[in-house]
Structure formats: C-alpha cells, structure tokens
C-alpha cells in the first residue's frame, strides 16, 4: 500500500480524463456519421 500512498492521484485523474476524451471523441463522431447526422 506504500506504493499507492506515494503515487500522486491528481496526474492520474488528469490522464484518465484526457484518455476518456481521446477515446470518446472519435466514438461520438463515428456514431453521428453512422446515424447520418451533420456536425
């Protein structure tokens, strides 16, 4: 548990948030394009 205590959680949350945006962005665009929606 010392390793977890030594880790700074803020950068981890930031990387996770950025990762979700990077993953969700193309998915949303693909769904809109698949449904024939215009951006």
From Swiss-Prot:
PSII is composed of 1 copy each of membrane proteins PsbA, PsbB, PsbC, PsbD, PsbE, PsbF, PsbH, PsbI, PsbJ, PsbK, PsbL, PsbM, PsbT, PsbX, PsbY, PsbZ, Psb30/Ycf12, peripheral proteins PsbO, CyanoQ (PsbQ), PsbU, PsbV and a large number of cofactors. It forms dimeric complexes. NCBIfam families: PRK13686.1 (NF010239). Keywords: Membrane, Photosynthesis, Photosystem II, Thylakoid, Transmembrane, Transmembrane helix. GO terms for biological process: photosynthesis. Coiled coil: none annotated. One of its GO terms (cellular component) is plasma membrane-derived thylakoid membrane. The keyword DNA-binding does not apply. Pfam families: PSII_Ycf12. It is a single-pass membrane protein. The gene is psb30. A core subunit of photosystem II (PSII), probably helps stabilize the reaction center. InterPro entries: PSII_Ycf12_core-subunit. This is Photosystem II reaction center protein Psb30. HAMAP family: PSII_Psb30_Ycf12. It comes from the Bacteria. The keyword Ubl conjugation does not apply. Belongs to the Psb30/Ycf12 family. It comes from Crocosphaera subtropica (strain ATCC 51142 / BH68).
């Amino acid at each position: 548990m010392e390793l977890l205590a030594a880790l700074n959680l803020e950068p981890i949350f930031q990387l996770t948030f950025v990762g979700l945006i990077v993953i969700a962005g193309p998915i949303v665009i693909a769904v809109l394009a698949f449904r024939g929606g215009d951006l």
